[in-house]
Structures are given as C-alpha cells and as structure tokens.
Amino acid sequence: MIETSDFITPESEEELFERIEPLQANGITSLSYLVVREGKQFFMKQLRPEHKDNPRYILIFKKEFAIGQRISHPNIVDYKEIGENSEGIYILTEYVTGETVEEKLANDPDYFRNNINLDNFFRQLLDALGCLHSHNIVYCDLKPANIMLTRINNNVKIIDLGFCDTDDYAFSAGMSENYAAPEQLQKASNKLDTRTDIYALGRLLQHIEKRRGRRLPSK
C-alpha cells in the first residue's frame, strides 16, 4: 500500500516539469498530459478537478501505481512515480511514441494483413499478459485503445493498468463492453480470473480479423 510519504510534493509544477502539454487521450475520471523533465518526456495522468478530492478515485490511482510498480516487462508501459501538485494526485509513466491498435488499423490497414506482423503482435501481447497473470493480476480491459504499437519496430505496449483486478484491489475492476467477458457483464467480480483476459483476447483477434477482411467463427 502506498503511504502519503511516498508522494513527491513539489512547491509548484514549474519546479518539477519544464513543459506540460495537454493530450487528447483523456479518460472519464482523468486528464492526460505530455510532460518534460530534464529533457525527457513522460506521460502524466491526473484526476479531473471534480474528482481530485474523491477518496475512491484517489485510492484507484494509488492502486494503479502500486500494480505498475510490481511489473517490469518490455511490452507493458513502465510506471515511474506517483505525486501530487496543486491540481491533485498524478501518475507518471514512460511516454510511448506510436499508435494504438485502433489507430494502426485505420492508418495502416495493410499492417495486420501481413501474417508475420500479426503473429509478432499476438506473441508479444500474450507474453505481456502472461507476465501480469504470473503476478496474479487480471488486466480486465483489453481493447484496441489500450494497446499501443511503438513508432520504431511496432513493439507492443499495454498501457493503462487502472482497471486491473488483483486480490488486494478487486473492487475497482472495470471493463469495456465490446470486449468484456460474460462474468464482467454480469458484475460477478468474484469470478474474474485469467480467463477473463483470454476472452477479451479472442474478441480482439476477432476484431482484427474482421478488419483484415476475414471472419472467425462466432462460437
């Protein structure tokens, strides 16, 4: 569990960051920024002003960072630090330059039509999920928007661990309906396990194959 003493609390944002640039990748409860410190870029996720004093959302942020700190894998975004400034709690992760899977499908429709690219994508994704599962973490929100392909080499990066389910933080698991397993749709959080992610992986494959002009069996 993260205690208050673990937070970085500068007197002002200017003392910590050289540049803060808003991004469009905002969530329902959070805002996103590209920040620069000592010449290096980071992704900053911060609670929206209307939620910054909400104990539940603060705990969810702490949960996300605690999970991120447990994981070290080349295909999962690297969590750097958690802190607090005049706008409230924030999380810093590595800044990934590239595209989400959904953006890749739209901007480069031939990419996944190449079987080597497709195989490489799913091998890396499975390896990343295997790492999470080996730490008793269920990702719970596998979808095209939460998977990036890096600009160089198109390496997989799973981003946003905010909806992960663990034994310690099971109450805050989330989902995206189009990729949610039946137990998620039924709000049966006590039934979530690694198979929940495998179901979403199948839905993701189905989505990509459809965009490739192919169809997988529905059953």
Model-derived features with residue positions:
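Activation-segment/catalytic-loop signature of the eukaryotic protein kinase fold
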Residues: 82
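AlphaC helix of the protein kinase catalytic domain
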Residues: 101-112
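Conserved short submotifs of the Hanks-type protein kinase catalytic core
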Residues: 86-100
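AlphaC helix of the eukaryotic protein kinase fold
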Residues: 51-70
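Conserved activation segment of eukaryotic-like protein kinases, specifically the C-terminal portion
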Residues: 171-184
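Activation segment signature within eukaryotic-like protein kinase domains
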Residues: 121-122
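Catalytic-loop of the protein kinase fold
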Residues: 133-149
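Conserved catalytic-loop aspartate of Hanks-type protein kinases
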Residues: 197
